[in-house]
Amino acid sequence: MSGEGETSVQGHVDLASFYDKKQCECLNESDENGFKNCLTNSPSYLESDCDEQLIISISFMQPVKIHSIKLKADKEKGPKTIKLFINRTQTLDFDSANSYAPVQELILTPSDLEGKPINLKFVKFQNVQNIQLFIKDNQSGSEATQIEYLSFIGSAISTTKMGDFKRVAGKKGESH
């Protein structure tokens, strides 16, 4: 499994290097324990502010296929219900996240919060420009949700840059 790092999913990689960090954001994050804390596997964490709900929006620099999600979190304060949305033109607000139908909904158990890959419906996550997670509640129903680490496992979609093509024959603008 060389070149796959710690993903433990054959043929896929951690997609963190494809994040467009300027386009990533989190709603209802606490000032002291913000969103960036959960993007690295470190002792810090992301924590919700006013209540247990969070909306995390991650954009990618190029289209990706997402196979699975990895979460590390406290067994009491970790997420329980997560709604996943893809390719939204704007970040969801909490009312929309509650009412819109997600691409997939995950109901997590404490054992899902140990950092092992949680498989997604791969066919539904094929051409992903951005993904938004609505964390509806946490394991214990406490006021704050915490996430120590969040990552997506998948692969980049090869894109064609039309500027890289060279004319084969004929003159510019000439048809067959």
Language model segments and positions:
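Disordered, acidic Ser/Thr/Pro-rich linker "stalks" and the adjacent N-terminal cap
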Residues: 1-59, 168-176
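Aromatic, loop-rich ligand-recognition surfaces of beta-strand-rich domains
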Residues: 43-96, 122-176
